[in-house]
């Protein structure tokens, strides 16, 4: 599997196709986001490690340029070292991506902590300095005040853009921004 991924990466580099990795805490909606923007079904379940391997889909950006989006395994706090090693090949996609899309579950009371955990893991992997868009997902499930508070709490941690949306509903003011 590792050899196959390496071959696929070399082909992407040869074709000069931009890549983005969808990262975030487990059950934040990463696979659902990939399904939404690619128009193809990606398995998404409300359970730990529903995604065990990467899934990549090619989308076309509004200006016609192709982009390869890769769904990665969800992060969890205090991930045992042996699991980090087991998921290394899938986590490697974040390191090799041109930029990252971090999905944060706005309805989770631990949303900020999960966001910070994801940043810590990305830093440990050597991907913490990648350009990033943060998707504040499931905003349809939280009051407007909570959404605003979350955006305010996340803003100091990074210099990118926070995109509020509901992946499940397929809407939100940020949906068009996801198409970078």
Where are these regions (language model features)?
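Conserved G1/Walker A P-loop phosphate-binding module
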Residues: 1-77
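Flexible beta-alpha connector loops of hexameric P-loop NTPases
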Residues: 41, 73-83, 105-111
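Conserved C-terminal guanine-recognition region of P-loop GTPase G domains, centered on the G4
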Residues: 88-160
């Amino acid at each position: 599997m590792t050899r196959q991924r390496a071959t696929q990466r070399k082909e992407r580099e040869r074709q000069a196709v931009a890549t983005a990795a969808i990262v975030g805490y487990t059950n934040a909606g990463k696979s659902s986001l990939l399904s939404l923007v690619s128009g193809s079904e990606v398995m998404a379940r409300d359970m730990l490690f529903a995604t065990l391997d990467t899934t990549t889909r090619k989308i076309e950006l509004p200006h016609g340029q192709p982009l390869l989006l890769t769904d990665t395994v969800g992060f969890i706090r205090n991930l045992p070292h042996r699991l980090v090693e087991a998921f290394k090949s899938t986590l490697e996609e974040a390191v090799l991506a041109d930029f990252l899309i971090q999905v944060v579950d706005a309805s989770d009371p631990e949303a900020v902590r999960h966001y910070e955990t994801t940043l810590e893991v990305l830093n440990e992997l050597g991907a913490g300095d990648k350009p990033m868009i943060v998707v504040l997902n499931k905003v349809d499930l939280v009051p407007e005040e909570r959404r605003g508070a979350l955006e305010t709490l996340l803003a100091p941690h990074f210099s990118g853009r926070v995109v509020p949306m509901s992946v499940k509903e397929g809407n939100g003011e940020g949906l068009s921004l996801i198409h970078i």
